[in-house]
Amino acid sequence: MANPTIIRLQDGNVMPQLGLGVWKASNEEVIAAIHKALEVGYRSIDTATAYQNEEGVGKALKAASVAREELFITTKLWNDDQKCPREALQESLKKLQLDYLDLYLMHWPVPAIDHYVDAWKGMIALQKEGLVKSIGVCNFQIHHLQRLIDETGVTPVINQIELHPLMQQRQLHAWNATHKIQTESWSPLAQGGEGVFDQKVIRELADKYGKTPAQIVIRWHLDCGLVVIPKSVTPSRIAENFAVWDFRLDKDELGEIAKLDQGKRLGPDPDQFGG
């Protein structure tokens, strides 16, 4: 079996290509989920202030027998905190029981309040101080990203966006790549696989490779060069989602999955959300 792949970000830091998402998990659930994930081999955990489970993540990490430098921990600056990223980060670090973050992401641009450029400047300062190794964004459209770059000269290393077979965001993914921004997929299984796992091509590939539909979709993300963070609190599924290193999809198979794209957004519109 091949080793789990890592991605080198444009700032020189590296991150695992596959991590555990903990959206909607309670503090109690997240402790058990992370314990299982670390046991299986995950080293990247993606949380957020808005998930209200940073304390659970912190407890799980504190109890883990994995060295801090082997872990890659991400959390996110919530919309209400865009005016005070320093205070928000310090609160997150306290809950996570960490001295530094591997990745700090601005959760949404919230153009209605128009603080995202100033928030980004604050995040740049936090990175310079060593409180955060890498900084990036979530849910930013091309015009939001361009403005950040134009006004600060600092490009996010990650743009974490809704991305799954029904919403492939190929134009944004390509723009990110051109600007050396790594695209990361949230809701990678289209919220439990509805409308995806029952697609003929997914079922056929699952049969061909002796894998589950979820494993096929996760492998699709990996083979498209995306960082992917499937969310689960179910031990068997956490293990299943990580058992994807012993096969690859070929170019034609990736092309067949590309045909499933409907531009079907399941989450909020980044131009409208918040404010």
Regions found by a protein language model. Name each.
Residues 2-7, 55, 59-62, 87-92, ...:
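Alpha-helical scaffolding within the catalytic cores
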Residues 109-275:
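Beta/alpha (TIM)-barrel catalytic core signal, keyed to glycine-rich beta->alpha loops juxtaposed to Asp/Glu
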Residues 25-38, 81-97, 143-146, 167-168:
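Short, acidic/polar
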Residues 10, 85-106, 125-129, 150-151:
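CE4/NodB-like, metal-dependent polysaccharide N-deacetylase domain
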Residues 42, 98-101, 132, 156:
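A structural motif
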Residues 25-28, 46-56, 78-85, 111-114, ...:
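Acidic-and-aromatic substrate-binding clefts and catalytic sites of carbohydrate-active enzymes
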Residues 68-81, 103-109, 163:
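A short, structured active-site edge motif that brings together acidic residues
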Residues 1-71, 122, 189-190, 256, ...:
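N-terminal binding-site loop/beta-alpha segment at the start of enzyme catalytic domains
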